[in-house]
Each structure stands twice: as structure tokens, then as C-alpha cells.
Amino acid sequence: IAAGQPFLAVQNIDNYFPIPSEYMPNQDTFMLHVKGESMINAGIFDGDVILVKQQNTARNGEIVAALVDDSATVKTFYKETDHIRLQPENDSMDPIIVADCQILGVVFGVFRFF
């Protein structure tokens, strides 16, 4: 998933990764590889794997995986008066302002391999 400019989303299962049940909020959980640096101030870096609780709603301030048109991105979600703001957590990047988007889920964890 893009942590930068959104990119075309294609559902593709690369692998399965066992996770202890105490770390899983429910069965509707998936993982995504992060590409880009828009979420570095939130501790999400290029190459990380994020854990996402699948749901189609989000509260202001939650980090979400979202579809904008056919492009997927990870950003902080804000529902404002007449639009949605998908805010990067990188001071050098601008927010994405859209009339609507599809929430894929809320990020609740990060795996980092080094």
C-alpha cells in the first residue's frame, strides 16, 4: 500500500503470516506492505508491514488503509464539513482531499523486519 502517492490497488495475496491470537482484534484482519514515506512521523516506514482491521468506517485521527478511486493509500483520516482529508504524517507532504473514499480498514499494528 502506498504511504506516499496512491497507487492502483489490486487484490493479491502474497503470503500468509501466522500472528498470535492475542494480537488480533478479530478474524477480519489483513496485512499490507508499505511503500513510501508519508507516514514516517507516525512510525510507519517504507518496507514495514501494517496490520489492518477490516472495516468500512473510521473515526477522525485513525490511521486507515483507503481506496481513492482505484488507488490504495495509508493515511490519517479526517471527515471534515464537505470533504475527507487523508493526512500524511510527513511534514513535507500535502494531504489528499476527496469528496469520498472507501475505507478498507483501520491500522492497529506494524511489523518491521531488519
Description of each model-found segment:
Residues 102-114:
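Glycine/charge-rich catalytic "coupling/switch" loops of P-loop NTPases
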